[in-house]
Amino acid sequence: MKSPKVPKPTIKRLAMYNRFLRELREEGIPKTSSHEIAEALNIKASQVRKDLSYFGEFGKRGVGYDVENLCLKIHKILGTERVWNVAIIGVGNLGRAISHYPELEKYKFKIVAAYDVDKRKINSILLPGIPIKHIKELKNKNDELDFEIAILTVPSNVAQEVANILIEAGVKGILNFAPVTLNSDDRVVIENVDFVISLKTLTYEIVSKYD
């Protein structure tokens, strides 16, 4: 259902809509509207309608949206109607914190593997049933990976090398927390998360607002 013409900010907002709809569903609320979604997320109702229009018709004017139906359709658009197996690559403080984040399994992202290079960590247990393995084991894997997504939390000076190992091993997507731009080909999708860039964006907004 996705189109390459859909802007990335739209996809990110869809994930926000999905989370809000799940909250409504858990509260037993059957109907909502673009105005209600917009008010909850501090955006314009016209933006909500525009974002949804990329993927077809979802509601009727004056009637609104069926919460359950819209939630399921957005899940399908985002690919989160099924479980995604995830590996933590780099089991430092950040990697451990992410692995224990309760929202992951709630939204069908299941940690199934963990890799590091620190000999002191190898074979220790990250989560029940998930021992930490050495990254070199990925080089020796001849069979299909047991995960599709890698969360990369390694130092920037080794991030590209580790990403290359993951790509050659057959990973489909990398969520990269290293503060470096990774080079890749069309075999893998890379999403970068950079806290410093987000903080700089925040400081710009603060300066613009108060100076």
UniProtKB/Swiss-Prot annotation:
<dbReference type="InterPro" id="IPR036390">
    <property type="entry name" value="WH_DNA-bd_sf"/>
</dbReference>
<dbReference type="GO" id="GO:0051775">
    <property type="term" value="P:response to redox state"/>
</dbReference>
<dbReference type="GO" id="GO:0003677">
    <property type="term" value="F:DNA binding"/>
</dbReference>
<comment type="subunit">
    <text>Homodimer.</text>
</comment>
<dbReference type="InterPro" id="IPR036388">
    <property type="entry name" value="WH-like_DNA-bd_sf"/>
</dbReference>
<comment type="similarity">
    <text>Belongs to the transcriptional regulatory Rex family.</text>
</comment>
<comment type="function">
    <text>Modulates transcription in response to changes in cellular NADH/NAD(+) redox state.</text>
</comment>
<dbReference type="Pfam" id="PF02629">
    <property type="entry name" value="CoA_binding"/>
</dbReference>
<dbReference type="InterPro" id="IPR003781">
    <property type="entry name" value="CoA-bd"/>
</dbReference>
<dbReference type="GO" id="GO:0005737">
    <property type="term" value="C:cytoplasm"/>
</dbReference>
<keyword id="KW-0804">Transcription</keyword>
<keyword id="KW-0678">Repressor</keyword>
<keyword id="KW-0805">Transcription regulation</keyword>
<dbReference type="GO" id="GO:0045892">
    <property type="term" value="P:negative regulation of DNA-templated transcription"/>
</dbReference>
<protein>
    <recommendedName>
        <fullName>Redox-sensing transcriptional repressor Rex</fullName>
    </recommendedName>
</protein>
<keyword id="KW-0238">DNA-binding</keyword>
<dbReference type="InterPro" id="IPR022876">
    <property type="entry name" value="Tscrpt_rep_Rex"/>
</dbReference>
<feature type="DNA-binding region" description="H-T-H motif">
    <location>
        <begin position="16"/>
        <end position="55"/>
    </location>
</feature>
<feature type="binding site">
    <location>
        <begin position="90"/>
        <end position="95"/>
    </location>
    <ligand>
        <name>NAD(+)</name>
    </ligand>
</feature>
<keyword id="KW-0963">Cytoplasm</keyword>
<dbReference type="GO" id="GO:0003700">
    <property type="term" value="F:DNA-binding transcription factor activity"/>
</dbReference>
<dbReference type="InterPro" id="IPR036291">
    <property type="entry name" value="NAD(P)-bd_dom_sf"/>
</dbReference>
<keyword id="KW-0520">NAD</keyword>
<dbReference type="InterPro" id="IPR009718">
    <property type="entry name" value="Rex_DNA-bd_C_dom"/>
</dbReference>
<dbReference type="Pfam" id="PF06971">
    <property type="entry name" value="Put_DNA-bind_N"/>
</dbReference>
